[in-house]
Amino acid sequence: MDLNTILIILGIIALIILVVHGLWANRREKSQYFKSANTFTRDSRLREPPAHIQSASEEKKDANTSTPTAEVSPAQRTFAFEAEKQFAHEQQAVEQAIENIKITLPKEEQPYQAKIEPDTPPTSPALTTIAEVENYANQEEGIDTHSEQLRQQLADLAQQSPSVTLAALQEEQALMESQAQQQASEDVRQDTDATFIMMYVVAPENYQFQGARLAKILDELGFLFGEHNIYHRHSDLSVNSPVLFSVANIEQPGTFDYNMHDFSTVGIALFMQLPSEGNDLMNLRMMIRAAKSIAEDLGGFVLTDQQAIFDDQAEKAYLDKVR
């Protein structure tokens, strides 16, 4: 049960108890002033004094039995009338207070019901032509679009805001799709044209190239440690010049450590992207000479991209790719 409802019920019970106690107290007070509540009338209230006055009279009679019975004085009658008037006024105030008590229980909240409305695209006068407005008016509202005044208003509206027909929107969308497809085709063509020529220099079995010696040889051949943490051979030995070919580590993740003294690898990969800066044939010959120099100095072997021994026949096949 809700806490508010429990508090309201407890308040009602407490209020009823207070009202009953008040009525009981009033009746008790009433019995002190009157002999009988059932025979109590306005005339009897005026004729008979209250109980405490009668008891006082009786005590006086007992004290002085020889004294004749004393009659009720006008002052005593006035006191009794005022007491009864006050009691009636208090009882009327209690009854009026009970009638004015109004207790309202909180209304139960109705469950929220979401109204699902169909999604309808907003209509805009700028997206319709005069003919479309006339067609819509004839079909939906039954408006007489042959009226000269209405046609003039439609013409003024069309001049104030440019109209875009559905056919124009479809044509623009088709043009955008065509441009996107053309751009995608160019990107694919560029990726296809950008081929790589690769060869490997590997250490003998159960051996590795030490980083310090490898770095020294690469420096002597003009390689510079740079982008992607690999070595690059630039056209004029400057990091700002175009890259001719590069050297990467064949072990994952394919990079070299900046501190090559603690580095070792089983082999390296030399690769050149075609077309390259300048003459592709000259750049390829330079890369082949660099691979042979590294293998000779480190005691390794030069392999093709198919991991075959790079001999004279393989060299001729490589050079034929760029001729």
UniProtKB/Swiss-Prot annotation:
Give any single GO term for biological process: FtsZ-dependent cytokinesis
Q: Which stretches does the entry tag as region Disordered?
A: 44-73
- One of the record's GO cellular component terms: plasma membrane
Name the UniProt key words of this record, in alphabetical order.
Answer: Cell cycle, Cell division, Cell inner membrane, Cell membrane, Membrane, Transmembrane, Transmembrane helix
Q: Indicate where this protein is primarily found.
A: membrane
- SMART domains cross-referenced by the UniProt entry: ZipA_C
**TM region positions:** 5-25
Membrane topology, Periplasmic segments: 1-4
Q: What does this protein do?
A: Essential cell division protein that stabilizes the FtsZ protofilaments by cross-linking them and that serves as a cytoplasmic membrane anchor for the Z ring. Also required for the recruitment to the septal ring of downstream cell division proteins.
What is said about its interaction partners and assembly? Interacts with FtsZ via their C-terminal domains.
Regarding protein family, the annotation reads: Belongs to the ZipA family.
Q: What is the protein named?
A: Cell division protein ZipA
State the organism of origin: Pasteurella multocida (strain Pm70)
| Lineage, opening ranks | Bacteria, Pseudomonadati, Pseudomonadota, Gammaproteobacteria, Pasteurellales
